[in-house]
From Swiss-Prot:
NCBIfam families: pheS
Catalytic activity: tRNA(Phe) + L-phenylalanine + ATP = L-phenylalanyl-tRNA(Phe) + AMP + diphosphate + H(+)
GO MF annotation terms: ATP binding; magnesium ion binding; phenylalanine-tRNA ligase activity; tRNA binding
Keyword Cytoplasm (UniProt): yes
Designated name of the protein: Phenylalanine--tRNA ligase alpha subunit
Gene: pheS
InterPro entries: aa-tRNA-synth_II, aa-tRNA-synth_II/BPL/LPL, Phe-tRNA-synth_IIc_asu, Phe-tRNA_ligase_II_N, Phe_tRNA_ligase_alpha1_bac, Phenylalanyl-tRNA_Synthase, tRNA-bd_arm
Length: 341
């Protein structure tokens, strides 16, 4: 059979097979079978080499014309297949507008985040600047510079998460105090919100992770009266009612004197379940910055004095909203969270 006849037969065979192709994969396989390196057109190249010299130009042109014809058919078929596949995809993804809609509840702030923001805003209005520090802290900043003795129980692994012998997950936001005192100049008035971590048993009253806000003020002539006045204003604003403040002597390594801060309960001393029938709510630990902490930060305690107060945000949220179990804040139960959104 002459090459011209073979080319014509190849065209007809290709068109017949092309009419049966309905997918991109089948079209690719057909293209490889005809135009690939080992395809049918390879035999025409071999025959062209054996063709007499005076016929090679004509035969070569005929082979190229046939190849171009097939390539054009493949291109057109590919375009048609793509359009069909897109149309099918559109049908699969088509939205049935007759179906009932699914309600989407709007998000809201977590109750802990809301209380944290409220607390920080109050301190900012009282003239404090917001500062933060890493959750991963050196043992020196978390303990030593805050006047914790080497044998203090808080340094033990059963109370603190150690990442290595000299690095811990901070147990309080007082590490901000150390960092700010060492790099700032009085007056220094800072509020420091953040996460804290303690190796404790999880119960209704305690958790291994919690939020704390520390506020401290350093300058000349800062006194315990300044601390009391600030706390009274803060809790009056936070609880949105008139409150009485009660200070009880306590011990914290980084303050002297150290105090526990109580505010009067809404029951007005009548006694209720919230205050455990005492008439008072324990809300914070505070005191005057310890002279050794000031020395560790490069300040002369004979010249400068300051106060510091630390409060747990979950504790405040529990008191503000009558929540009895701290674990509820971490359980992501929408029935609980939606009450505050």
């Amino acid at each position: 059979m002459a090459i011209q006849e073979e080319l014509e037969a190849t065209k007809q065979q290709f068109c017949a097979e092309l009419s049966q192709v309905n997918s991109s994969k089948d079209l690719f396989d057909l293209k490889v079978r005809y135009l690939g390196k080992k395809g049918l057109f390879r035999c025409f190249a071999d025959k062209l080499r054996e063709c007499p010299a005076d016929q090679k130009a004509l035969m070569g042109a005929s082979i190229n014309d046939c190849k171009t014809y097939i390539e054009n058919l493949i291109r057109d078929k590919n375009h048609a297949i793509l359009l069909a596949e897109e149309a099918a995809e559109f049908l699969r993804e088509k939205i049935d507008i007759t179906l009932p809609g699914e309600p989407h509840c709007p998000g809201g702030k977590h109750i802990v985040k809301k209380v944290l923001d409220d607390v920080v805003d109050i301190f900012v209005h009282l003239g404090f600047c917001v500062r933060e520090a890493p959750n991963i802290e050196s043992e020196e900043n978390n303990f030593s510079l805050l006047n914790f003795e080497e044998d203090h129980p808080a340094r033990q692994m059963h109370d603190t998460f150690y990442l290595d012998p000299k690095t811990v997950l901070r147990t309080h936001t007082s590490n901000v105090q150390v960092r700010e005192l060492r790099k700032g100049q009085p007056p220094i008035k800072v509020v420091a919100p953040g996460l804290c971590f303690r190796n404790e048993d999880i119960s209704a009253r305690s958790h291994v992770i919690f939020h704390q806000v520390e506020a401290f003020y350093l300058d000349r002539y800062v006194t315990l009266s300044d601390l009391t006045a600030m706390l009274t204003e803060f809790y009056h604003t936070f609880f949105e009612r008139e409150i009485e403040l009660r200070l009880r002597h306590s011990y914290f390594p980084f303050v002297e004197p150290g105090i526990e801060v109580d505010v009067s309960c809404e029951c007005r001393q009548a006694g209720c379940s919230l205050c455990k029938h005492t008439g008072w709510l324990e809300v914070a630990g505070a005191g005057m910055i310890h002279p050794q902490v000031l020395r560790n930060s490069g300040f002369d305690p004979e010249i400068y004095t300051g106060y510091a107060v630390g409060m747990g945000i979950e504790r405040l949220a529990m008191l503000q909203h009558g929540i009895s179990d701290i674990r509820l804040f971490c359980e992501n139960d929408l029935r609980f969270l939606q009450q505050f959104s």
